[in-house]
């Protein structure tokens, strides 16, 4: 028969699964709503630009594969997805490889930025030619298309500096997204490669930040929820002129107050015990946090002195009496033995051990011995 603890734990697990399913259903409904809005908007104008789609999808956590499916759904209902060429050309012209402020950077990274700056940008015709060759299995074309867009990765990675990952790591993660974009690019859809690759690069970087930037990993969907909560908090701060209450945030986000409090708790960054303290930073936070499990120095010293006095008093008994008391009260290993167990140790009856114990305790109660221990009992 299950005990109460098992029943309680089972109930908690069921509740946890129920909450998880509710969150999943809510996220799914939110995604479906956004897709429906895109379809309605696209049918009115006949087409959608990449930027319009990305602006709508920015609020939800979608993988690149899911984005591909949304493109297919839009095209299946007669909505053309087109590239905003003017916008992308401006973006490419604005790409810069300068190092962000406050970023310590060594010579190898400087050399990398210098090298990728030498690679010329591709024209739309060159991109189409390379894409066709990639489709036919040309590995050199794949390499050339990726190298020509490395500066795009650096430009995007700069926007995510200060979120818990090194600049070089952000570039590396963005490069992985770029490689994926090279493999998936379909020039027949009409937009430039940089338009298409931007999403993959951003997605790779944001997922890496979610997975690696925190000491305790938080799932990607929760990172998105935390970001949304932060945006709502900032908006309310500007409107109210003070820090918003959880109840006010919950109303805007359309979720229970307890859930908002839970998200706020999850969003807190852990603080290292090695955090430097003071102007000279010669102390650490851990130096000022007491160990609740460790005894106070005064108590530890008193216990040690009591132990020394107890050993001296036990030495005044006969060897047999001393050993019986040590076993009966577990003075050596913390495990008290029964009369039966001690009797087997000495090969005598329980009654005999009881008599030896009683005699030894009478001796310890004598004022000549007991007065030495009384001070430790106050």
Swiss-Prot record:
A GO cellular component annotation in the UniProt record: cytoplasm
Keywords of this entry: Cytoplasm, DNA-binding, Sigma factor, Transcription, Transcription regulation
Mind listing where the DNA-binding region sits, in residue ranges? 339-358
- Where, per UniProt, does this protein localize? Cytoplasm
What are the start and end residues of every segment in region (Sigma-70 factor domain-4)?
313-366
CDD domains the record matches:
Sigma70_r4
Keyword Cytoplasm on this protein?
Answer: yes
- Hydrolase as a keyword of this entry, yes or no, is no
Record-linked Gene3D superfamilies? RNA Polymerase Primary Sigma Factor (1.10.601.10), Sigma-70 factor, region 1.1 (1.10.220.120), Winged helix-like DNA-binding domain superfamily/Winged helix DNA-binding domain (1.10.10.10)
Q: What biological-process GO terms show up in the record? A: DNA-templated transcription initiation
Q: Where is it mainly found? A: cytoplasm
Instruction: Spell out the InterPro entries in the cross-references.
Output: RNA_pol_sigma-70_dom, RNA_pol_sigma70, RNA_pol_sigma70_r1_2, RNA_pol_sigma70_r2, RNA_pol_sigma70_r3, RNA_pol_sigma70_r4, RNA_pol_sigma_70_r1_1, RNA_pol_sigma_70_r1_1_sf
Q: Region entry Disordered: which residue ranges?
A: 1-29
Out of the domains of life, which is the source?
Bacteria
Q: Name one GO molecular function term.
A: sigma factor activity
Recorded hits in SUPFAM superfamilies, A to Z, give:
Sigma2 domain of RNA polymerase sigma factors (SSF88946), Sigma3 and sigma4 domains of RNA polymerase sigma factors (SSF88659)
**Short motif (Interaction with polymerase core subunit RpoC): ranges:** 169-172
Q: Where is this region: Sigma-70 factor domain-2?
A: 145-215
Annotated region (Sigma-70 factor domain-3) at 224-300
Q: Which residues cross the membrane?
A: none
Function description: Sigma factors are initiation factors that promote the attachment of RNA polymerase to specific initiation sites and are then released. This sigma factor is the primary sigma factor during exponential growth.
- Assembly notes: Interacts transiently with the RNA polymerase catalytic core.
The entry sums up its family as follows: Belongs to the sigma-70 factor family. RpoD/SigA subfamily.
Q: What is this protein called?
A: RNA polymerase sigma factor SigA
Originating species = Clostridium acetobutylicum (strain ATCC 824 / DSM 792 / JCM 1419 / IAM 19013 / LMG 5710 / NBRC 13948 / NRRL B-527 / VKM B-1787 / 2291 / W)
Q: What is the lineage of its organism?
A: Bacteria, Bacillati, Bacillota, Clostridia, Eubacteriales
């Amino acid at each position: 028969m299950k005990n109460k603890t098992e029943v309680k734990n089972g109930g908690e697990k069921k509740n946890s699964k129920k909450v998880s399913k509710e969150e999943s259903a809510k996220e799914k409904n939110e995604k479906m709503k956004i897709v429906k809005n895109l379809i309605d908007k696209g049918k009115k104008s006949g087409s959608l630009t990449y930027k319009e789609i990305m602006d709508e999808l920015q609020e939800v956590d979608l993988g690149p594969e899911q984005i591909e499916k949304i493109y297919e759904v839009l095209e299946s209902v007669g909505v053309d997805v087109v590239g905003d060429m003017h916008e992308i050309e401006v973006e490419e012209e604005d790409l810069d490889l300068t190092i962000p402020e406050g970023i310590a950077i060594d010579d190898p990274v400087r050399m990398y930025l210098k090298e990728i700056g030498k690679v010329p940008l591709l024209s739309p015709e060159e991109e189409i030619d390379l894409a066709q060759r990639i489709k036919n299995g040309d590995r050199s074309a794949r390499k050339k298309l990726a190298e020509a867009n490395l500066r795009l990765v650096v430009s995007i990675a700069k926007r995510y500096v200060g979120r818990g990952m090194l600049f070089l790591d952000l570039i590396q993660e963005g490069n992985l997204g770029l490689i994926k974009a090279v493999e998936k690019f379909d020039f027949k859809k009409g937009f430039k490669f940089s338009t298409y690759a931007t999403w993959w690069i951003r997605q790779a970087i944001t997922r890496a930040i979610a997975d690696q930037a925190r000491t305790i990993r938080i799932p990607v969907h929760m990172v998105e929820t935390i970001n949304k909560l932060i945006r709502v908090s900032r908006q309310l701060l500007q409107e109210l002129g003070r820090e918003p209450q959880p109840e006010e945030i919950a109303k805007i986000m359309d979720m229970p107050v307890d859930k908002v409090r839970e998200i706020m708790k999850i969003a807190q960054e852990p603080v290292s015990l090695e955090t430097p303290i003071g102007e000279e930073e010669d102390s650490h936070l851990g130096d000022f946090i007491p160990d609740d499990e460790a005894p106070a120095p005064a108590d530890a010293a008193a216990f040690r002195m009591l132990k020394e006095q107890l050993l001296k008093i036990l030495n005044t008994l006969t060897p047999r009496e001393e050993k019986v008391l040590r076993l009966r009260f577990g003075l050596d290993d913390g495990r008290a033995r029964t009369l039966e167990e001690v009797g087997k140790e000495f090969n005598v009856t329980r009654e005999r051990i009881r008599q030896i114990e009683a005699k030894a305790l009478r001796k310890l109660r004598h004022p000549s011995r007991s007065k030495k221990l009384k001070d430790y009992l106050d």
